[in-house]
């Protein structure tokens, strides 16, 4: 089989399964997973003691992430949400308020436990990002997927250097997936990604670089 025919066959396969691929991308590169991965990688790489950072993350990530996620799953089971990504803007306010309240309580707990500053900085940034997106959601639907992957990609490149630029390819990939699934318009994805990129810059230049 020639290279050209292989490319055509692959393109046809993708075209015939594009919705399934978009759904898979949305699940794998979801805000929950992206947030955990970027926090773990940067905290372990740039923390003073990688083992200590890993220990803190093993404690804090389940405490911070699991209760809101289980709450969303419960709302889906109860028929109040279509899925955990809250596609209907009118149903987002209550879950987002609960998530904001929970993360705020976790920040108080993190401060009380005297967790490393870089770990606290990441969770504080997550709180601020969700807060900004929640305020926008009061008036207009915006892409949390786009904001999260854009913030993570920006922070990664700023911390790791130019070799990490390919990470930014995930931003349009996630954007395409959300648009293909008709969960967002291109404008909603664009502005979500823009807010995420700004938060990534603030996270790195405003917090992390001052802690290293």
Predicted stretch roles:
Residues 34-36, 97-108, 147-150, 195:
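Core segments of transmembrane alpha-helices
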Residues 22-25, 82-99:
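Juxtamembrane helix-capping/reentrant segments at transmembrane boundaries
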Residues 52-67, 125, 155:
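Alpha-helical transmembrane segments
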Residues 2, 68-79:
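Membrane-water interface of transmembrane alpha-helices
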Residues 1-22:
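Short, Lys/Arg-rich, polar N-terminal cytosolic tail immediately upstream
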Residues 25-46:
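The first (N-terminal) embedded transmembrane alpha-helix
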Residues 116-212:
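Membrane-embedded catalytic cores of phosphoryl/pyrophosphoryl-handling enzymes
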Residues 48-52, 80-90, 112-117, 183-187:
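Membrane-interface helix-boundary motifs at transmembrane edges
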